[in-house]
């Protein structure tokens, strides 16, 4: 196995069914998501700001490193939060001193909530069938 000479860090983030792998390496600020441009994959500004918030808090800029992101499963919002967690973990691997700052903003917390399973005798997880007295 050949070792990379470029100093990069890889981390994984998860949220619900979404799994995101983030590769952080020194560069010019290019962001690639599943082979597409960052703005093309995440068209809303709020999504892009949410994803890049750990980078802005630690480095203060997005132009110092390149990101290669691979996402599988889940919906758009789950993918956004999974990617943010992956980016925060990658930053932590690269810069251990930033742990307190990342933790105080809640970027290192994995949201444990998942979809509750459907129960038999019910329409959904908690919703019952209509009750008829007679």
Curated annotation (Swiss-Prot):
GO CC list:
cytosolic small ribosomal subunit
Q: Name one GO molecular function term.
A: RNA binding
Q: Which UniProt keywords apply?
A: Ribonucleoprotein, Ribosomal protein
Region ranges (Disordered): 98-134
What InterPro entries does the entry give? Ribosomal_Su5_D2-typ_SF, Ribosomal_uS9, Ribosomal_uS9_bac/plastid, Ribosomal_uS9_CS, Ribsml_uS5_D2-typ_fold_subgr
Query: What biological process terms from GO does the record include?
Result: translation
Q: What are the Basic and acidic residues biased-composition ranges? A: 98-114
Basic residues bias (residue ranges): 115-134
Family to which this protein belongs = Belongs to the universal ribosomal protein uS9 family.
**HAMAP family listed in its UniProt record:** Ribosomal_uS9_B (MF_00532_B)
| UniProt name for this protein | Small ribosomal subunit protein uS9
Originating species: Chlamydia caviae (strain ATCC VR-813 / DSM 19441 / 03DC25 / GPIC) (Chlamydophila caviae)
């Amino acid at each position: 196995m050949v070792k990379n000479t470029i100093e990069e860090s890889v981390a994984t983030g998860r949220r619900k069914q979404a799994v995101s792998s983030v590769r952080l390496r020194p560069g010019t600020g290019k962001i690639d998501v599943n082979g597409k441009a960052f703005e093309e994959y995440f068209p809303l500004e709020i999504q892009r700001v949410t994803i890049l918030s750990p980078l802005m808090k630690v480095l203060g800029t997005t132009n110092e490193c390149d990101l290669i992101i691979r996402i599988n499963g889940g919906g758009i919002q789950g993918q956004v939060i999974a990617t943010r967690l992956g980016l925060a973990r990658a930053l932590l691997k690269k810069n251990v001193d930033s742990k307190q700052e990342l933790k105080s903003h809640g970027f290192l917390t994995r949201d444990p909530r998942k979809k509750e399973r459907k129960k038999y005798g019910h329409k959904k997880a908690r919703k019952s069938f209509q009750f008829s007295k007679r």
